[in-house]
């Protein structure tokens, strides 16, 4: 499948979404190449439950990119990234960011390696492992997790990867009052940003948790 094989309104939906998120239109081409590869592999390997490319634009690409204003540079570990979400869209739009895509599922890890090769994306790499097994203590400025666990659960499996003073950026739906109240000692919420994802109804919040 090439980009032209995607439904004709997919490109327009992505272009409109990038504009709404104040992102450069030049990012559309690599994002569409990634989407095309994801659609193709998903038919065989079931990488995501979302099947419709139009829905993938909203629920995968634009949702991932909603956190982009809050991560500028440095090192980032994306925990339980699945097929590379949000890590690959962030690596595309933030070339100064060094992204490690942490995923234990072999099919998803193979897909991501092919995607990085296909996109010639030199600022990202795949770590095929569970987050708790990645032996890189205090190596990262940022952690992300889009659909992995509660805040305390994310910290339990991946908190060792974050340097002191670093930040965990966790995507949540409604404001997670109970999860924030259950944070372990040594971790504190810095900010909670309401997110607007073009085309997506429902609440989205980005919770930024700092490691003391």
UniProtKB/Swiss-Prot annotation:
Q: Which UniProt keywords apply?
A: Cytoplasm, Methyltransferase, rRNA processing, S-adenosyl-L-methionine, Transferase
**What InterPro entries does the entry give?**
rRNA_ssu_MeTfrase_G, SAM-dependent_MTases_sf
The primary site where this protein sits is: cytoplasm
In the record, what terms sit under GO molecular function? rRNA (guanine-N7-)-methyltransferase activity
Q: Does the entry feature the keyword S-adenosyl-L-methionine, yes or no? A: yes
The regions listed as transmembrane in this protein's record are none
The EC number(s) given in the record are 2.1.1.170
Positions bound to S-adenosyl-L-methionine: 80, 85, 131-132, 146
Q: Name one Pfam family in it.
A: GidB
Q: Where in the cell is it found?
A: Cytoplasm
Q: Does the keyword Transferase apply?
A: yes
Catalytic activity field: guanosine(527) in 16S rRNA + S-adenosyl-L-methionine = N(7)-methylguanosine(527) in 16S rRNA + S-adenosyl-L-homocysteine
* Enzyme class, UniProt record, top EC level: transferase
Q: SUPFAM superfamilies attached here?
A: S-adenosyl-L-methionine-dependent methyltransferases
Entry GO terms, CC = cytosol
NCBIfam families named in the record: rsmG_gidB
Q: What exactly does this protein do? A: Specifically methylates the N7 position of guanine in position 527 of 16S rRNA.
Give the family per the record.
Belongs to the methyltransferase superfamily. RNA methyltransferase RsmG family.
The entry's protein name is: Ribosomal RNA small subunit methyltransferase G
Q: Which organism is it from?
A: Xanthomonas campestris pv. campestris (strain ATCC 33913 / DSM 3586 / NCPPB 528 / LMG 568 / P 25)
């Amino acid at each position: 499948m090439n980009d032209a094989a995607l439904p004709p309104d997919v490109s327009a939906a992505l272009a409109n979404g990038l504009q709404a998120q104040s992102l450069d239109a030049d990012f559309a081409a690599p994002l569409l190449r990634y989407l095309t590869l994801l659609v193709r592999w998903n038919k065989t390997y079931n990488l995501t439950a979302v099947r419709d490319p139009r829905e993938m634009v909203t629920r995968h690409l634009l949702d991932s990119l909603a956190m982009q204003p809050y991560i500028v540079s440095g090192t980032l570990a994306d925990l339980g990234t699945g097929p590379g979400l949000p890590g690959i869209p962030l690596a595309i739009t933030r070339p100064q960011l060094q992204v490690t895509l942490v995923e234990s599922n072999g099919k998803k890890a193979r897909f991501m390696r092919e995607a990085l090769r296909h996109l010639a994306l030199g600022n990202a790499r795949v770590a095929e492992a569970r987050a708790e097994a990645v032996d890189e203590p205090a190596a990262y400025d940022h952690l992300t997790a889009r659909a992995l666990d509660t805040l305390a659960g994310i910290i339990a499996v991946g908190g060792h990867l974050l340097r002191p003073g670093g930040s965990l950026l966790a995507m949540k739906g409604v404001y997670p009052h109970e999860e924030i109240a259950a944070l372990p000692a040594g971790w504190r919420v810095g900010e909670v940003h309401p997110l607007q994802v073009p085309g997506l109804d429902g609440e989205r919040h980005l919770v930024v948790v700092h490691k003391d």
